Amino acid sequence: MQLLCVFCLVLLWEVGAASLSEVKLHLDIEGHASHYTIPWTELMAKVPGLSPEALWREANVTEDLASMLNRYKLIYKTSGTLGIALAEPVDIPAVSEGSMQVDASKVHPGVISGLNSPACMLSAPLEKQLFYYIGTMLPNTRPHSYVFYQLRCHLSYVALSINGDKFQYTGAMTSKFLMGTYKRVTEKGDEHVLSLIFGKTKDLPDLRGPFSYPSLTSAQSGDYSLVIVTTFVHYANFHNYFVPNLKDMFSRAVTMTAASYARYVLQKLVLLEMKGGCREPELDTETLTTMFEVSVAFFKVGHAVGETGNGCVDLRWLAKSFFELTVLKDIIGICYGATVKGMQSYGLERLAAMLMATVKMEELGHLTTEKQEYALRLATVGYPKAGVYSGLIGGATSVLLSAYNRHPLFQPLHTVMRETLFIGSHVVLRELRLNVTTQGPNLALYQLLSTALCSALEIGEVLRGLALGTESGLFSPCYLSLRFDLTRDKLLSMAPQEAMLDQAAVSNAVDGFLGRLSLEREDRDAWHLPAYKCVDRLDKVLMIIPLINVTFIISSDREVRGSALYEASTTYLSSSLFLSPVIMNKCSQGAVAGEPRQIPKIQNFTRTQKSCIFCGFALLSYDEKEGLETTTYITSQEVQNSILSSNYFDFDNLHVHYLLLTTNGTVMEIAGLYEERAHVVLAIILYFIAFALGIFLVHKIVMFFL
């Protein structure tokens, strides 16, 4: 429905001065016209603060033709509208029959019984919360005042600045349209402004005369348009460093669903962050395009909600879409220091937190993958209203433990598992970044399992994803692991050697991976581990393995005040390798734990499958030249049996060693399988010698009697 309101001001002249007596209102709704006359005094009572003088100035009906023509000539006109036939997706799914309808403004305990209960949220109250703020959508400043009437309304916005306030971007949005405005102040103090407007053509704001949208529209398809508003001078200035592919920008904004579009933008930002684009952002096409796309991601969610009118929005869709926006909000805050106002519903957050309170977090890993992801998304969305943080970590850890137990050893994560763990990781990330986690075992277990999943093949898969720009580079357990040994040379040796991969792209992928593992990141800190206080030289730590009752700190020097000290002294490592168990989180009283102990060898490693005698232990492998390879945490008999029945131990490579780390702080090297093989080979050789000797003796006896 399009509503056109035309105010006719009737001026009565009294003593040479103009005064407003009444307002004549003409309403034209889809061809049906109505006329009303409202006394000004009555209108002022209903709308206090409404100034007739301001209305008169804004209408500018006395503007002469020359001024109007000059204003028209200043504004940039497109060379032509790019018409594209695009398929517009059905974003919000139909609400299932029997769904509980929830009013976002009236969420109370017990409104939904649990995760299995279908539910939806009424669109109108939800939209009102998303666009709660009142602000100036269309400012009374040039060039906007040349083209639009000033507009204040309920809105949301994304705002950021680069180089102080020299460059600013604001993506202001209603549920109808988005206006992304770039503003740059030059060294001379000149200000250049350019705006991109996206939305349904029929819902775009009214224009001043003599403008029309066809001359301003860059791209159009079906219901949607992309409009440029700037002056010719400002356009020429921006064109020096901002030449966006408007066709691609517009096509993605129209054809992608809200959640998939937000994920696309998130992936761009992750890659940008890894390349250092956050620390030193370039004012180029890629950066400026990404800024606009960030605001489009937020707009598409609010727009989809608004398009349902007086309907109801499926809660699963809301959980998925607002999870993506939450993650996106986190990274633009970290990357650009961006501010997001609005696009947040306290009703949705409260409902999500209440639903999570009905779930036994420690049993979350036993649910289906679909329910795990739904619950973890709700946990992220409802985090501000959750209250109890440790329970959420327990849920993410339960899901990770379940995935770890059924994951093949040393294999990269498959797509579905990577997505599930990516969703769960943001519960952990939020607590680490907000510095609210206490010394809980759940977080230690989460990081231990992440460390165990960070194998050479997993690293290779992530590097491939980063080099090709695919989603496999978006998340890896390595990002939340306690591995600190991954250098550039080591990562290059793990990178896939494929003809399709450009070596420059691989090199950039390695740099990005290293950037993601930077110790300056909050999520790479191990401050929450009690044994952390026993470490004096953090730059010498290679890996931390927190087991039950003992934490092993592997380092390249002896400066760890642990309960004991082991050294891999029989190797040819270019740098030393020390293992310091910290038992019951108690540091040694002295500077170090004394002289290194000899690591004993197990010559007969038993292949038992009847009981889990190694549960709670960890296996650590290292190469005499390359250093640490990987660690495996034995969580169950299935994991133990998988280790014993597979080719886990590569004893053909005599330069690789396997250490067993126990829960009492003891370290042992496993060499039994190699010794078994040697005994078998020796037995075969002795049998062959005996057989040959027997044949020789028989030959001599036969020859003697002949």
UniProtKB/Swiss-Prot annotation:
Disulphide connectivity of cysteines: C278-C335, C454-C478, C534-C587, C612-C615
Name of a matching Pfam family: Herpes_glycop_H
Membrane topology, from the record: Single-pass type I membrane protein
Residues of this chain annotated as glycosylated in UniProt: N60, N435, N549, N604, N664
Gene Ontology biological-process annotations: fusion of virus membrane with host plasma membrane; symbiont entry into host cell
Location in the cell: Virion membrane; Host cell membrane; Host endosome membrane
Signal sequence region: 1-18
Region Interaction with gL, annotated ranges: 165-229
PTM comment text: N-glycosylated, O-glycosylated, and sialylated.
GO cellular component: host cell endosome membrane; host cell plasma membrane; membrane; viral envelope; virion membrane
Similarity annotation: Belongs to the herpesviridae glycoprotein H family.
UniProt function note: The heterodimer glycoprotein H-glycoprotein L is required for the fusion of viral and plasma membranes leading to virus entry into the host cell. Following initial binding to host receptor, membrane fusion is mediated by the fusion machinery composed of gB and the heterodimer gH/gL. May also be involved in the fusion between the virion envelope and the outer nuclear membrane during virion morphogenesis. The heterodimer gH/gL targets also host EPHA2 to promote viral entry.
Protein name (record): Envelope glycoprotein H
The species this protein was found in: Epstein-Barr virus (strain GD1)
